[in-house]
Structures are given as structure tokens and as C-alpha cells.
Amino acid sequence: MNNILVTGGCGFIGGHLVDQLKANYPQAKIVVVDDLRTPGNHTIKGVKYYLSSIQDRVLLEELKTKYSFDTIFHLANTPRVRRAIEFPAETIDNNVTSTTAVCDIALEHSSHIYFAQSSSVQYDETVSNPYTLSKLFADEILRLYEIEYGVQVTNMFFYSVYGPREADYGPYSTVVRRFKQRVDMNEPLEIFGIGTKERDFTNVFDVVTNMMLMTEDPRIKNGEMKDVHFGRGKPVSINDIADAFNHNKVYKFDMPGEAQKTHCQEPYGEYLGDVLKYITEWKKLYVQQSDS
């Protein structure tokens, strides 16, 4: 990889990915486009940042004419199922239009697109929320560009990623981030439903390490493998997550539109992170800092 574009490269996974890309490919030209729509402002030296939307027509033309990207990591999106349910039009518009823009660049440069797909699309027999719908639309656009125009596409499926610099989406944050906030505010952990929903929590360092392996995998380069799953393969219930925090909890009415269980059936690479150990260590450090 010599010329790399990362959309959403200031965010949680994107920021860690850019760190790793810079370390692994110090001579590569790395360009990040991020409109900071979602929390995150991580930047590093030696990387070109455009703090704007990939949908901006002027920026899009500059990216097409000024650079020649061989690789595009398309991570920019409006995430979080619960937020999407509240803001459906914004979610669908942003996730679909940004994907079309990325395909336009890839067509111009013959780029390989690595697309951040949602693991939830595998579990909904019917479309139950705007986020999943937007990702399905985006997938169809990518499929069209792949079949009709020869753009190479690899789908990346992420499973409940957690770790340092995890984005703060307020009430829409991931369960690990949200529970950290509740502990910090000394408020009970809010569990929607009865806490039996399971998620395949995966450490961000494991994810980006395996993303680097993915880019060098000949099966992916030659199109033999189209889908890559970044998940530990060991789902954990929300109740178990709450118990690891060892904090007061309260149960609330369930939220519609969410899968009962997400489970990575075909993990790509190795995964060393254990979410329960991560939480236990975080809580221990939090208590020590609070006491001091």
C-alpha cells in the first residue's frame, strides 16, 4: 500500500487504524477524511487530514484529481442502532451517499475498497432499523460497482469493538462505554430488557492488528475471500458485562430493533483481548484513582 484513504479516520476504530498504518507503512501517503460528525478527533503527524464530509463535491473532486489511492478504508458512517432509530433520514442519507462517493474515487483510481459493514445485517431476517437498512443499501451500491465496473471490494464485519479512545455517543454509546459513564457518575447501570442479549465484544487492538494481516492476505487480494469478520467468537451477555463492573444496576423496557445475539462464526486472525478482564482492570484502576 502506497497511497491510502481512510474515511472516518479520526474516530475510534479509524484512529487506531491510522496509527497502525503509519507504523507499518511509514513511507505511504495516508489521507484521512472525517467530518467529525461522530465523537473523535484523533490525529497524528505525517497524515493529511480533511475535516470535511466525503460527500462534499469540491473535496471529492480534489481527492480524485490530486491523489491516486490504491487502498480505501471506508469507515465513515452514522453508527449506533438506537441513534439511527431516532434519526432515520440522516442515517440513511449519510451512510448511502458517502459510500457512493467512495465508489466514485475507487473507480477513478482502481482502488481496493475495504468497507466497514455492520455485523447486524447478518442477523435481521427483515430490516428492523434504519442503520441496518442503510448498510444494506450501501452493500448493493458496492456490489454494483464491483460487478459492473470492476471495483474490488472487501467487506469488513466488526463485532462490538471496545478499548481505549472509545467514542462517547452519550445515550447512544456502546454498552462498555455507557457503563463506564454510569460508574463515573455514580448512577446505576441501565440494562434494556432482561440482560440476556449477547454481543461478541472485540478489543480494538486485535481488530487493527488483524486488519493489517487482511491487507497482505493473497486470498483477499485475488478476490477469493470477500468477507472478513473481526470478532472474538465468544459472545458475552449484557448481564455478565454489568456484573464485571460490580456496580448497581437497573432494568428498563427493552429497545426494539436490536438483535438478541451477535456471534462471529468465522473469526479472522487471533484475538487475545477478553472484555471481562478489560472491565475488571479498568474498574480496579478507577477505584485506585478515585481513592487517591
Role assignments for model-derived ranges:
Residues T7, D93-V96, Y169, S173, ...:
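Short, solvent-exposed loop/helix junctions and linker helices
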Residues G40, P164-A167, Q260:
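Short beta-loop-alpha junction of Rossmann-like oxidoreductase domains
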Residues F137, I141-Y145, V175, F179, ...:
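Hydrophobic alpha-helix immediately C-terminal to the catalytic Tyr-X-X-X-Lys motif of short-chain
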Residues S128, Y159-S173, G193-F205, R219:
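Glycine-rich "substrate-gating" loop/helix at the edge of Rossmann-like oxidoreductase active sites
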Residues M1-V161, F205, M211, D217, ...:
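N-terminal Rossmann-like NAD(P)+-binding domain of SDR-like oxidoreductases, especially those catalyzing
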Residues V102, L142, F179, P267-Y268:
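Structural element of the ATP-grasp superfamily
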Residues D184-S292:
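C-terminal substrate-binding subdomain of Rossmann-fold SDR/epimerase-dehydratase oxidoreductases
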Residues I13, S98, V175, S237, ...:
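Conserved alpha-helical elements of sugar-nucleotide-dependent glycosyltransferases
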